[in-house]
Design a protein with these regions (language model features):
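Short hydrophobic beta-strand element within catalytic cores of glycosyltransferases
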Residues: 32, 297-300, 310
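Short His-centered aromatic/hydrophobic patch
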Residues: 84-90, 108
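A conserved, positively charged/aromatic
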Residues: 98, 104-134
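Active-site donor-binding acidic/aromatic loop of nucleotide-activated sugar
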Residues: 234-241, 251-261, 267, 317-318
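Conserved acidic donor-binding segment of nucleotide-sugar-dependent glycosyltransferases
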Residues: 312-313, 317-325, 332-339
């Protein structure tokens, strides 16, 4: 049973779906305890089973109630292993696992800040089980340094990409055309298209890109179109701030907020370059790997897990985070490189992604970790 706050959108959520599918294909049953979200339909279509409860809550009384619900579920369904993917639900999941003597695993999907002893204790819940899974070597090194964990208790399993879904040969032109029309891009628009995919939240670096675009416009560059694909998930103030910043810079024709996208393979094919301008380190950065699987060049912040997934000058470029001038320079370089050279870089990224970041390899490693824990507990 996996426990995740929500199944809306994001790397942890996609990995939850991937692992649930792998468990089912291996002959097991896959439960996911979560508040819910738009990806529940995919879970259930794969044969996974939803256990809906407010595991996203940080209210201690709600967390205790969740633990009780999880205990009942573990006993009723004879759950053999509990896997938490976030801190707040990890407390409920850990208590339930301890009460039922069920093996407990936690995945570090992010690098959590710890500016006090209390916060460090809160974060440490992820390390209190049988095994910690880190989603990159960067994350593994952070956990070891932060918590002094026995290295034998932590394993790095890089996130994987579904290469059946993210395969440029399997996306018909009708899908990219439908997206082009939905996003209001003219059929004869020949500008270089940049895509920043991800929920509208400050750490994703949208404001850096808006300022970079303003600098490019000031340098008389008008041969680009930037698309922000993602919804605000209730952060309406930030969405309004982005809209105002675009208008203030006179970039309404060059920067568009297009909302949530369900067809990311088509979105990457529709565009020329993917952007990942995060202002804080991504522990892995699936948004840097998926476009490479689709043969697209990536420009990413030079920190965190993207240092592992993007090869500077070969599959894309690494740029100082939060530096609009550096981002303007990198984006201008990508435009001037030309389509043929960008595609050659994209082919390098696609080849590397297929070698290192396959979802089947990630799932096999995760199920292998489960098996070792169950054997050790037997």
């Amino acid at each position: 049973m996996q426990v995740v706050p929500e199944l809306e959108t994001g790397g942890a959520e996609q990995t939850t779906i991937d692992v649930a599918r792998a468990v089912i294909e291996a002959g097991g049953r896959a439960f996911v305890a979560t508040r819910g979200g738009r990806m529940v339909a995919r879970l259930e279509a794969d044969g996974g089973r939803l256990a809906q409860m407010p595991v996203q809550s940080k209210n201690p009384l709600v967390m205790l109630g969740n633990a009780s619900r999880l205990v009942d579920l573990i006993r009723r369904e004879k759950v053999s292993l509990v896997h938490a993917r976030s801190r707040a639900p990890a407390f409920s999941a850990l208590w339930a696992a301890q009460a039922t003597r069920t093996p407990f695993v936690a995945t570090y999907h992010g690098v959590y800040k710890a500016n006090s002893a209390l916060k460090r204790w809160y974060n440490a819940v992820m390390t209190r089980g049988d095994l910690v899974i880190a989603n990159s070597d960067y994350t593994r090194d952070h956990v070891l340094a932060e918590h002094g964990l026995d290295p034998a208790k932590i394993v790095s399993i890089p996130r994987g990409v579904d290469l059946d879904r993210f395969n440029p040969g399997w996306v018909p032109p009708l899908r990219t055309e439908a997206l082009r029309e939905a996003w209001g891009i003219a059929a004869d628009d020949r500008r270089t298209r940049f895509l920043l995919a991800g929920r509208l939240t400050r750490i994703k670096g949208h404001l850096t890109i808006i300022e970079a675009a303003a600098q490019m416009k000031a340098a008389s560059r008008h041969d680009f179109l930037i698309l922000f694909a993602g919804d605000d998930q209730g952060r309406t103030d930030y969405g309004a701030e982005l809209t105002a910043a675009i208008a203030a810079a006179g970039l309404q024709d060059a920067v568009k907020i297009v909302g949530h996208c369900d067809d990311m393979p088509a979105a990457y094919l529709l565009c020329d370059v993917a952007l990942l301008p995060t202002t804080v380190p991504e522990s892995f950065g699936r948004a840097a790997v998926e476009p490479q699987a689709m043969g697209r060049t990536v420009i990413a912040s030079n920190h965190g897990g993207t240092v592992e997934t993007v090869v500077d000058g070969t599959t894309g470029w690494l740029v100082p985070p939060g530096d609009p001038a550096a981002w303007a320079e990198a984006m201008t370089r990508a435009i001037d490189l030309g389509a043929a050279a960008r595609l050659r870089m994209g082919e390098s990224g696609m080849s590397r992604t297929r070698q290192l970041y396959r979802v089947d390899a990630m799932c096999a490693a995760t199920l292998g970790a489960y098996e070792r824990i169950l054997e050790a507990r037997a």
